[in-house]
Design a protein with these regions (language model features):
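Short charge-dense sequence patches
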Residues: 1-3, 29-39, 76
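Negatively charged, low-complexity tracts enriched in Asp/Glu with abundant Ser/Thr
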Residues: 1-28
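Compositionally biased, intrinsically disordered low-complexity regions
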Residues: 11, 45-46, 106
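Surface-exposed polar/charged interaction patches
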Residues: 11-12, 31, 90, 94
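Aromatic side chains
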Residues: 13, 38-39, 103
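Short aromatic-glycine-(Arg/Gly/Cys) micro-motifs in beta-strand/loop hairpins
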Residues: 33-68
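Short, compact, well-ordered microdomains
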Residues: 64-107
């Protein structure tokens, strides 16, 4: 059964190692164990903007309920860190600022 609690961006940023993000989304929603998949999320913390979490953390009900919107998917932590850098760079190049939340709302 697909859990609708997890919120996903319509067009998430994808790391180079991601081939079929919709399949990954389905597996994450089902609670499958995907040890190499990392997710970039908006942060719930007021002093942070983006966070990187391993997808397997969403197998726990509490984490599924409290997970902020997922805006990126990567294969491996290093790729996830590069993806965050790419997001910040894109926002800055297109706006001249780093208002990442506002930019992602309009994307």
């Amino acid at each position: 059964m697909v859990n609708r609690v997890i919120r996903w961006a319509r067009n998430p940023y994808l790391g180079e190692g991601i081939e079929d993000w919709k399949e990954i989304r389905t597996k994450v929603n089902k609670g499958d164990f995907l040890p190499t998949i990392f997710l970039v999320t908006l942060s719930n913390h007021p002093d942070h903007v983006l966070e990187i979490i391993p997808s397997f953390m969403l197998r726990q009900r509490w984490n599924r309920k409290t997970c902020p919107k997922i805006v990126g998917i990567a294969k491996g932590k290093k790729e996830a860190m590069n993806l965050v850098a790419d997001i910040v760079r894109e926002v800055y190049e297109n706006t001249g600022a780093v208002e990442i939340r506002e930019y992602l709302k309009k994307r």
